[in-house]
Amino acid sequence: MAIHSLQKTQKINLSISEVWDFISSPKNLKEITPDYMGFEIITDLPEKMYAGQIIQYKVTPLLNIPMSWCTEITHVKEHEYFVDEQRQGPYKFWHHQHHIKPIKNGVEMLDIVHYQAPFGIIGELVTPLIVTKKLEEIFEYRFNKLIQLFGEYKEG
């Protein structure tokens, strides 16, 4: 079965420190996740993210069926990137890289997600119709929410 990938970029007129502080705090995930996902963090979270950190959530990704999701923060390079990997949850495979880099008048965020649906060939068949479509919706929501929070990016 194939591992699929999705890449999304967004530019924000904030400093690298401001963007890092926002994206590296798991507490902000709920704010940039659509309400219909029923996203709830179960884990008590420290102020700072660290490699090896385990975060447990409840989500409702499809058909209003609540699921547990557990991710591990596997890599952290402050003000540059972090990686979360699913340890248990709705995907057979989930690897999400969050990169940020300084650009003129702000920061460019790059998300790279590699994922695979469960259920073998059935999961593979529904991936483009349901899974990829749902991920696109979630990232579109996040894109618009970040504009709402921090404004439209302006180069000059």
In which residue ranges do the predicted regions lie?
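Hydrophobic ligand-binding cavity/cleft-lining segments
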Residues: 1-46, 50
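Beta-strand/loop substructures that line and gate deep hydrophobic ligand-binding cavities in soluble
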Residues: 86-137
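Short, surface-exposed coil-to-beta transition loops
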Residues: 5-7, 66-70, 92-96
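A short, structured loop/turn motif at beta-sheet edges
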Residues: 16, 74-81, 99-108
